[in-house]
Amino acid sequence: MKITRMNVTPVAMADPPLRNAPGIHEPYVNRLIVELVGDDGQSGFGEAVFSSQTYEDLQKIASIVEGIGALDHAALYRIVSAQLAFDQEEREDPILKNFRTVAPKPPMAVSRTFSAIEVAALDLAGKQLGVPACDLLGGKVRPSVTFAAYLFYKHAGGGGEGDDLREDVYGEAMSVEGIVAQAKQFVEENGFPSIKLKGGVFPPEQEIEAIRALREEFGPTVPLRIDPNCAWTVDTSVLVGRELQAELEYLEDPTATIPGMGEVRRRLLAEGIDIPQATNMCVTEFSQIPESVREDAVQVILGDHHFWGGLRATQELGRICQTFDLGMSMHSNSHLGISLMAMVHLAAVTPNLTYDVDTHYPWLHESDEIVEGGKIKFTNGQIAVPDTPGLGVEVDRDALARAHERFLRISYRDRDDVGYARKVIDPNWSSALPRW
């Protein structure tokens, strides 16, 4: 069960023009596919968020993992840490650069690099042993994983450029009516039982109206959440919490920093309003949890194995959340089926996963998927945990080659929602937050 080779393949997939507080998604988003080849000829796959730095880091590791066991994750982590940890403090974080209100912290190069390797190693070991990846993580506690509909304000267009345009499956949604129509389509096609709206795009009054319209359309039993990506001041966050106290299951990252979130929490509680606050922005590493608990700033943490350091590390996050009576869900970014199935296996082994999981996956066009059989289907908003070896999916080599060729052809590299907003929305677009 030794690793004989590691391949790193950058790929591109079309991305619709989805809006968020920093700006707008570019026509393409890139990912990194990690392949570990075993001594029996089988391959395991992992998927990472693309940045030029992460690509370089993974390439550094690729030449020195030969001979390591697919289950010797401690050795793999030592290799990654030794190669990358020395210069972490000097790097700018390629993701957080879009969110200038987030408190500066060291980039998570080791966590992000190791995560994709760990997933690939679990996939490989599962295939070699004939067991699903979740069994290697302690065994599943649920037979299926439930996801939430993830709504975005959206311009017309399906992503891609030139002669590589995608069909606009969901249409424009830049109004309250458009958001409700988008939600109905997501629920009808996938059966999602809960709904999340990416906010921070329009003045809060309009986004409050959108949440109320969703409540009216879907009734009192469908959980609703909103995430403005820290676009609001503390005062505005309190106002929104007050206005939507009857509608929201939780309020995600209304304002920046742990102290800011703590102040919102205290002021709402003083008014008798107990809306849980969630985050994937002010608590993104273990060292930030103590302050968050002291401040009572966050009641729900959105884990993400891509950023927290892998599947086992995110399992540990779940145990810490349970210790402090915190809820847990999962954060999402634009991703392919490898990451989706890694999320499914992680959710399957995390008892304290108390909320439906976020996913961008419905926004992925069928033609951009690289796993065999095409896009993975949701049934009643759920994906069953596979009993097949590894992650339960295989990579379509031809589709992988096409996605890599697309990456080589396009000019987009590190994600830049802000820069693209200056190109297509307003040349003077500012990413400064809070905006309201």
Outline where the language-model segments fall.
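Structured beta-strand/loop patches that form or line metal/cofactor-binding pockets in enzymes
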Residues: 1-45, 49, 56, 362-370, ...
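Conserved, mostly hydrophobic/aromatic
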Residues: 3, 41, 117, 130, ...
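Flexible C-terminal active-site loop/helix
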Residues: 4-13, 312, 316-320, 335-436
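Metal- or metallocofactor-binding catalytic centers and their adjacent structured scaffolds
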Residues: 37-128, 427-436
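Glycine-rich, aromatic-flanked loop segments that form ligand/cofactor-binding clefts
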Residues: 108, 112, 119-160, 335
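Active-site mouth loops of central-metabolism enzymes
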Residues: 146-180, 228-233, 278-282
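Alpha/beta enzyme core
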Residues: 177-194, 237-249
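Catalytic core of soluble alpha/beta enzymes
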Residues: 197-339
